[in-house]
A protein has these predicted regions:
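Compositionally biased, low-structure terminal segments
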Residues: 5-8, 24, 59
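Short aromatic-glycine-(Arg/Gly/Cys) micro-motifs in beta-strand/loop hairpins
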Residues: 1-18
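Short, mixed-charge low-complexity intrinsically disordered segments
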Residues: 36-64
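Generic structural motif
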Residues: 9-13, 27, 50-55
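A short, exposed loop/beta-hairpin motif centered on an aromatic-Gly-Thr core
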Residues: 15-28
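Compositionally biased, low-complexity intrinsically disordered regions
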Residues: 3, 28, 45-48
């Protein structure tokens, strides 16, 4: 399990967009998710980091 952080570019936002976090099974899945978002013509997304996490950490993050 990995946690990945990405930046969504929005021209109307003061800082040019916002940072968000999502989860995936593997690094490749995280990269594919971001690539799919960009291919769908949504707001541009830049992958910032991918961090391996334990199932327990995922559960803590997801619940809170």
């Amino acid at each position: 399990m990995v946690k990945f952080t990405f930046f969504v570019h929005c021209k109307g936002w003061k800082d040019g967009g916002y940072e968000n976090t999502h989860y995936a099974e593997t690094n490749q899945d995280a990269e594919r998710i971001v690539a799919n978002w960009n291919a769908e013509g949504r707001l541009p997304v830049t992958l910032l980091s991918i961090t391996p996490i334990s199932n327990a950490e995922f559960a803590r993050d997801y619940i809170y």
